[in-house]
């Protein structure tokens, strides 16, 4: 289906051409004065300069040609030369029925040429718990992935774990100090290693920060960790077996935590998976003359003549031969081109890492790791801050674990749901359902609270505001969906058959209903724009507008008590469409709605 605004523009453009003016002046936009009209065209203002006449003479001519067009209720020429457009309610009702008949797509066409897109979530380091700093990459990445999938693309989400480098040597060294008799440290051992890990997730989460602290104050400990890292990367059997245990224990725990966030990955690869590609990649860069030595390090120059700021060389190997994040990211691209051959690779990472990605992307293009046809995108996100405007912390100033934050919001939502239950005596929700509902609504509060902000901007994480059932919040959106579900259930309880409602939506009978239809009609344009700009906040803004439009219609209209049966069916059919569009949108944002609240 064509976007409504495009259909309107086509009609207005035809009128401009018929009146003897260039088609470029027929572009229509949403009205910036919704109290006067629904759409507007300002083309006559620009055309007046070219055709050397008063703008209103042009707009008068065009309006006269559109007077009898069945698409419009009215097209008014307003001085000095604007066209104010109102949609015909019968045309709008047909557009609604066409959307409803287009099951699961609602007028949004799938991509004609599906792309293969890899989304790199810039995942956490293994052996460390997820903390609030991991929230944005997970939440934004999941939504970007779901939007692209809904558009019809083949999307592969990769957690991209930090499982390489000194941190692994630190863990091995600290474990050796704690449990020196483990068989993994016996170089002469040639047998099978135990299948059971010699540590639990809670032990592992204590080992890493302890080791990290020691390495900063104890030089001999740091030396031992560097040696362990080198031996691990050199293939020492016992250390390789320990790495396998670290990964298994960590990933099991990470999967549980990501599951609670409703975030899922097609690939659970780490930096270590790209390491086999490093030697060949480095050799290629040397042989082809891309890489050269500079101050002891191997680098690739990536500055360009058009640069307005200094872009340092991309370091491939440090002076001691060790690789860096840039090395790993480039080798990961080599691996992805070989295994997935993507048309686009999207990286989710803090906006402060933008220089790193400029260097890596330029190096990848210059050295031929990726062809010109593969798009490389960095979605740089802002910081999640507390009410004091500083990065979000625990009350004692520490970094808050993500599961503790989610638990805090779950508890807050559970209290609100129980309060709601007391106010509504007929709402009998047992403890188990109340807890599950609280989890569902809490997740919406967190995700919507994040995604409703433009990704690149910092935002204040305000639990009180995010968990409110009023205003631009996740719980408000869910409350609207639950309200619609309740009306539909009552309709069916009285013998109504929702599945039999086909082409039942009739022309709007009041302003609230027409406003709801106009909001629904923006669905395909909104999702297309959110995909093209990797901008989930556009979907949030849309569903907030849609929820407000529905609630306005609901308060203005007697739905279930409507005596005209055909009109009642029209209302119910419109509610079904509203519910389905809200549900498909929140699914793209990565959360769902309960049946009751």
Q: What residue spans do the PLM features occupy?
A:
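Non-catalytic interaction-recognition regions
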Residues: 1-93, 108-597
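A common structural junction motif
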Residues: 103-107
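Short, charged, solvent-exposed linker or helix-capping segments at domain edges/interfaces
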Residues: 94-99
């Amino acid at each position: 289906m064509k976007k409504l605004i495009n259909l309107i523009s086509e009609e207005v453009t035809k009128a401009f051409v018929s009146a003897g003016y260039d088609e470029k002046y027929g572009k229509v936009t949403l009205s910036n004065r919704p109290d006067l009209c629904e759409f507007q065209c300002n083309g006559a203002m620009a055309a007046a300069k070219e055709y050397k006449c008063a703008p209103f003479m042009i707009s008068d001519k065009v309006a006269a040609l559109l007077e009898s067009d069945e698409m419009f209720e009215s097209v008014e020429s307003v001085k000095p030369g604007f066209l104010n457009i109102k949609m015909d309610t019968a045309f709008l009702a047909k557009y609604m029925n066409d959307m409803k008949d287009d099951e699961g797509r609602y007028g949004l066409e799938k991509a004609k040429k599906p792309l293969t897109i890899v989304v790199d979530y810039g995942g956490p380091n293994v052996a460390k718990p997820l903390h609030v700093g991991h929230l944005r990459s997970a939440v934004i990445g999941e939504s970007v992935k779901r939007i692209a999938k809904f558009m019809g693309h083949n999307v592969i989400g990769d957690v991209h774990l930090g499982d390489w480098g000194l941190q692994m040597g630190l863990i091995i060294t600290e474990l050796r100090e704690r449990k020196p008799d483990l068989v993994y440290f016996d170089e002469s051992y040639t047998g099978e290693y135990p299948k059971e890990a010699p540590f639990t997730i809670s032990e592992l989460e204590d080992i890493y920060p302890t080791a990290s602290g020691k390495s900063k104050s104890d030089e001999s400990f740091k030396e031992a960790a560097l040696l362990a890292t080198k031996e691990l990367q050199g293939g020492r059997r016992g250390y390789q077996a320990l790495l396998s245990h670290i990964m298994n224990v960590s990933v099991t725990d990470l999967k549980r935590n990501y599951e609670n966030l409703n975030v899922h990955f097609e690939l659970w690869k780490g930096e270590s998976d790209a390491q086999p590609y490093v030697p060949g990649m480095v050799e290629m860069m040397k042989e082809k003359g891309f890489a050269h030595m500079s101050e002891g390090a191997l680098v690739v120059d990536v500055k360009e003549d058009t640069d307005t700021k200094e872009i340092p060389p991309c370091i491939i190997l440090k002076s001691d031969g060790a690789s860096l994040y840039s090395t790993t990211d480039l080798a990961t691209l080599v691996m992805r081109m070989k295994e997935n051959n993507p048309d686009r690779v999207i990286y989710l990472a803090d906006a402060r890492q933008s220089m790193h990605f400029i260097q890596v992307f330029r190096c990848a293009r210059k050295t031929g790791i990726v062809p010109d046809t593969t798009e490389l995108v960095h979605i740089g996100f802002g910081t999640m801050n507390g009410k004091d405007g500083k990065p979000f912390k625990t009350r004692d100033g520490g970094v808050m674990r993500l599961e503790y934050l989610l638990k805090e919001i779950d508890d807050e939502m559970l209290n609100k749901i129980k309060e709601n239950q007391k106010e509504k005596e007929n709402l009998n929700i047992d403890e188990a359902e109340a807890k599950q509902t609280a989890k569902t609504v809490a997740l919406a509060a967190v995700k919507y609270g994040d995604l409703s902000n433009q990704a690149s901007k910092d935002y204040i994480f305000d639990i009180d505001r995010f968990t409110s059932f009023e205003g631009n919040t996740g719980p408000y959106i869910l409350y609207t969906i639950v309200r619609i579900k309740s009306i539909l259930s009552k309709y069916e309880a009285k013998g109504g058959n929702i599945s039999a409602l086909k082409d039942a939506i009739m022309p709007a009978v009041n302003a609230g209903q027409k406003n709801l239809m106009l909001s629904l009609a923006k669905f395909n344009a909104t999702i297309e724009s959110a995909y093209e700009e990797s901008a989930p906040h556009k979907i949030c803004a849309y569903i907030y507008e849609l929820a407000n439009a529905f609630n306005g219609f609901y308060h203005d209209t007697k739905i279930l008590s409507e005596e005209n049966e055909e009109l009642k069916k029209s209302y119910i059919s419109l509610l079904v469409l509203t519910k389905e569009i809200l549900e498909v949108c929140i699914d793209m944002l990565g959360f769902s709605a309960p049946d009751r609240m």
